[in-house]
């Protein structure tokens, strides 16, 4: 299957490498396609030159990394990232730099963050790196350094390597920290702020500094107490002089932050009552986290909001199993760091019982034996190098298309693995060539020595005969004796030299035979452990590696949040339940059709318990938070009239929607190590690598939660619960012993792909897709004018959900932020922007077209 692609991959890699003339080192993103110097391949792996000499295989797989924690509606939520964001909305042009590499995450060292070191070698760097300390520092500097070291106290004793490091990274505090926590740069305006405050961005620098202080201080006041509404009056009262002198600017900043969900979001006590008269009617399809967040915002802005939910509960893919003392999340499960995460605010508003996830994750082989630490670390290091190599192929050699088809991460990894296997065979061949060459040299030498020995023997006989002539000998006879002696001495010396060379060759031959190179790149055992890491990466992305985009699969890595990953021990569903309080939600109501025109919208829905019962809802705007899996469904689950534009449907088709399933096992007692949150099970085959590969111990009650990822996630949905639970117990008995593992009291098996209201777990960047598609998914749709020549209509159909937020996809916080984003967009459209100057018009809405990326 891969043979046809091998030669092409090898040739492409060789050509690029020959042109680049690279050195060994770690590659940094952005090289070949940007016209900058090409970085070298990752150390320890066969470089592009080797690629040219042999077959290339398919590619295999970065987060994350990862694994991702539970997604907003999936089963695991990928690590988000901290970083400045241009307001809560990322525009179509805000592509993130590509990074690929590996790092440990708080969720466990098994999680790939898939980041490459951001290092670019320059000539100066290389020359400095090669200097010794004596060459680098002057004599005065060396003496001063020595004196300073004498005065320094001895370093504190380091903790044993086995111990968990509980320390958290330092984060900025004060107004600067408030901006950081809100994902904003503290010292400059974002592009969204610049668009909303043109008078400030075009004004003097001092005016911008005043704006930034007011903005950051307002954020700080909100974050200090997010349980109570932060009013304009309270903000003005607490602002220090002279920043409180410009009340108009303070009001504009407060209105902007409130409108865009940076303050007064989530569940908080209102100081000002909701307006009695509602302005504008909005129907929200779906009551997941994005829909609930948007609904609360729109309601607080004074709009009339109704949510239509097909399930008999709120939360969507945030689903918690509860029975007696047993609590376990079937969907979203992990908070991926609190530094910059809006869930940090929600966790203060809601009773979220957060607990850090310990990083230690022992692995157990198929026979139940623990994987030795040295073997575990060696394979994990190789896994990291393989990912770095695929990044090098993509970003430095631009090997992203093969036979006019986008290359997947899975293909790339197999390419690198096969190149490594070829490299091992090449080394074997070279080794045997050296042995054969040494043997030939030894054979030739021994033949010389045999011939020389015969000559010496013959010459010795001649010398003996010449010496036996009794004196007095004539001059001729004397000369003959001396010449024979001289020749004999020379031959003996030559023989001794050959004997010395013989010893060296025999020693070399012995060394070569005693130290053969490895005959395989990966033993079958190594490959099984490597497949465990691949399964973990498939968990992070909720899809087989063969479907992931090689170039863009980790495009959101720059926005990862800081801090430990945490679990919600009392169940993640406490969040949507709290968000739903006080909202108009129609449960068991499935939307069948959405009609949108220049004058308004109409939503047709049915009762899921009695499909003959139809409801029609008229409104000014519709916010669609349907999961991407439902939007991809064929035939369509929801009909749009008129049909969605081609640029929207193409984005839906290009993007990937993954699958990840869980098995919840509730026991009457703990039989595993209670100090460990994670332990892995290494499958026996590549095909089954994702089957029950990771067990989680997170809750107070004795519960184990097993994950099924990759190809196994889809296969498992067609197998009965009894068989799946039986397989789980067999694995656990192999690890802990048959007598130690009791029958579970309760079991639950998720099947997210079969769920008609989800059709999968969460989005991923499929081969052929990119971060641009998330931006396209977020774009609202404007109906065409009903009458030719009529004014350009306004947008009527809006979209939110984890699949619409480029920087934070496949996460609960991403869903939350997308809901806040769309609430601000809808309110600006129908209520006007309160933060604009009186002389400014509300920003116009562009005509409907394919958004330029």
UniProtKB/Swiss-Prot annotation:
Cross-link (Glycyl lysine isopeptide (Lys-Gly) (interchain with G-Cter in SUMO2)): 443, 470
Activity control note: The N-terminal sequences of INSM1 and SNAI1 compete with histone H3 for the same binding site and thereby inhibit histone demethylation (in vitro).
Cross-link named Glycyl lysine isopeptide (Lys-Gly) (interchain with G-Cter in ubiquitin), sites: 504
One function term, GO molecular function aspect: enzyme binding
Pfam families: Amino_oxidase (PF01593), SWIRM (PF04433)
Catalysed reactions, as listed in the record: N(6),N(6)-dimethyl-L-lysyl(4)-[histone H3] + 2 A + 2 H2O = L-lysyl(4)-[histone H3] + 2 formaldehyde + 2 AH2
Enzyme's top EC category: oxidoreductase
Stretches assigned to the SWIRM domain: 175-274
Keywords recorded for this protein, A-Z: Acetylation, Chromatin regulator, Chromosome, Coiled coil, Developmental protein, FAD, Flavoprotein, Isopeptide bond, Nucleus, Oxidoreductase, Phosphoprotein, Repressor, Transcription, Transcription regulation, Ubl conjugation
Binding site for FAD: 290, 309, 311, 317, 333-334, 802, 811-812
Cofactor requirement: FAD
Phenotype when the gene is knocked out: Promotes neural differentiation. Accelerated emergence of neural progenitors and mature neurons in differentiating embryonic stem cells.
Biological process (GO), any one: negative regulation of transcription initiation-coupled chromatin remodeling
Localization in the cell: Nucleus; Chromosome
Factors inducing expression: Down-regulated during neural differentiation.
EC number: 1.14.99.66
PTM sites of type Phosphotyrosine: 136
Parts forming coiled coils: 111-152, 429-515
Phosphothreonine sites (modified residues): 60, 105
Modified residues (Phosphoserine): 127, 132, 138, 167, 612, 850
InterPro entries in UniProt: Amino_oxidase (IPR002937), FAD/NAD-bd_sf (IPR036188), Flavin_monoamine_oxidase (IPR050281), Hist_Lys-spec_deMease (IPR017366), Homeodomain-like_sf (IPR009057), SWIRM (IPR007526), WH-like_DNA-bd_sf (IPR036388)
Expression (tissue specificity): Ubiquitously expressed.
Domain notes: The SWIRM domain may act as an anchor site for a histone tail.
Family membership: Belongs to the flavin monoamine oxidase family.
Function: Histone demethylase that can demethylate both 'Lys-4' (H3K4me) and 'Lys-9' (H3K9me) of histone H3, thereby acting as a coactivator or a corepressor, depending on the context. Acts by oxidizing the substrate by FAD to generate the corresponding imine that is subsequently hydrolyzed. Acts as a corepressor by mediating demethylation of H3K4me, a specific tag for epigenetic transcriptional activation. Demethylates both mono- (H3K4me1) and di-methylated (H3K4me2) H3K4me. May play a role in the repression of neuronal genes.
Designated name of the protein: Lysine-specific histone demethylase 1A
Origin species: Mus musculus
